[in-house]
């Protein structure tokens, strides 16, 4: 079981990174993996805090989460004799730091500038390799440091997408239970309960999640970390990734302009909850209250891609059994579900 040793979320939290590293007994140089914009937003503050605490601090600027950039991070860390890595920014920077540090057998810190998905604290990363985005096993971060005064200034749609990613735990757990019954897959009651409870908290708090409120950012960060912990307990992503994530992964491949991961997972949850015979209206209403998209039009994706994703989703990670079964659903069934839920008109 891999869990972060420390999670700090609050206004101004990023300025304590140097002290946090000392309390974790880290030594030497830190390599900060970040993007051009996030360096200005948070990376420079992280570097200053590290230097004030007596650490060396260097940067690697990246744009995409690719194996090429992972290898660049590894090479630079070796060249600089860095002792630990810090992923500062969105999912791409954190995922690169996550995989590079795992391959180097180093600690890394996760310092998100947005709360858009549960990768900020998980032990899995999405990396582009050989033209495909693959999910890779990694180590969980040593610490997660989420500065809500920075996160709350990020585009609100990122926070809303984070809610969609958490809410998708509902159908992920249902799929996991189904796989356990039909395929004798390992099922952890504790991990499933934590994952479902996390989704329920976000749904029940939907009316309190608003733009510009640090309290909203803090609640979503805690939910994302909790979701990551559920995955760590399970030893897999099953508590937080089921048929709705498969649907999202297909959209990433086929849609000319995919929506955010959490947005697609949120809409996928509406569709898959309908297939499960559950309360899909509750999911839709919560997402709508939060301000996340609930239709293909709101995601900016044509109806035909929604239907194609629904019929092809079962092909993603076929070893993970879901409500879609081994053969998937027909185009006619997909259209019926999508129209019944209002995802397409």
Swiss-Prot record:
Pathway: Membrane lipid metabolism; glycerophospholipid metabolism. It catalyses: sn-glycerol 1-phosphate + NAD(+) = dihydroxyacetone phosphate + NADH + H(+); sn-glycerol 1-phosphate + NADP(+) = dihydroxyacetone phosphate + NADPH + H(+). Binds 1 zinc ion per subunit. Substrate binds at residues 118, 165, 249. Its EC number is 1.1.1.261. Belongs to the glycerol-1-phosphate dehydrogenase family. This is Glycerol-1-phosphate dehydrogenase [NAD(P)+]. It comes from Methanocella arvoryzae (strain DSM 22066 / NBRC 105507 / MRE50). The gene is egsA.
């Amino acid at each position: 079981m891999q869990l972060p040793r420390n999670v700090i979320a609050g206004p101004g939290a990023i300025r304590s990174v140097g002290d946090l590293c000392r309390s974790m007994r880290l030594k030497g140089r830190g390599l900060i993996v970040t993007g051009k914009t996030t360096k200005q937003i948070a990376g420079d503050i992280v570097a200053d805090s590290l230097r004030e605490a007596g650490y060396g601090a260097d940067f690697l600027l990246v744009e995409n989460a690719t194996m090429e950039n992972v290898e660049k991070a590894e090479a630079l860390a070796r060249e600089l004799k860095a002792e630990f890595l810090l992923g500062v920014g969105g999912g791409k920077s954190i995922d690169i730091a996550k995989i590079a540090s795992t391959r180097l057998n180093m600690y890394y810190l996760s310092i998100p500038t947005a709360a858009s998905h549960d990768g900020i604290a998980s032990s899995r990363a999405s990396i582009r390799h050989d033209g495909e985005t693959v999910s890779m096993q990694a180590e969980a971060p040593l610490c997660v440091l989420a500065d809500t005064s920075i996160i709350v200034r990020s585009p609100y749609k990122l926070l809303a997408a984070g809610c969609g990613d958490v809410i998708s735990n509902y159908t992920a757990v249902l799929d996991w239970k189904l796989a356990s019954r039909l395929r004798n897959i390992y099922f952890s009651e504790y991990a499933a309960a934590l994952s479902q409870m996390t989704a329920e908290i976000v749904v029940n708090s939907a009316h309190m999640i608003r733009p510009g409120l640090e309290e909203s950012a803090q609640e979503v960060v805690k939910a994302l970390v909790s979701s990551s912990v559920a995955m760590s307990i399970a030893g897999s992503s099953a508590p937080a990734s089921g048929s709705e994530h498969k649907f999202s992964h297909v959209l990433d491949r086929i849609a000319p302009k995919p929506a955010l991961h959490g947005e697609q997972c949120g809409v996928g949850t509406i569709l898959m909850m309908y297939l499960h015979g559950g309360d899909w209206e509750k999911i839709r209403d919560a997402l709508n209250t939060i301000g996340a998209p609930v239709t293909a039009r709101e995601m900016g994706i044509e109806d035909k891609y929604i239907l194609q994703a629904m019929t092809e989703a079962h092909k993603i990670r076929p070893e993970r059994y879901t409500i879609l079964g081994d053969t998937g659903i027909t185009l006619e069934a997909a259209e019926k579900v999508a129209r019944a839920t209002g995802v397409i008109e």
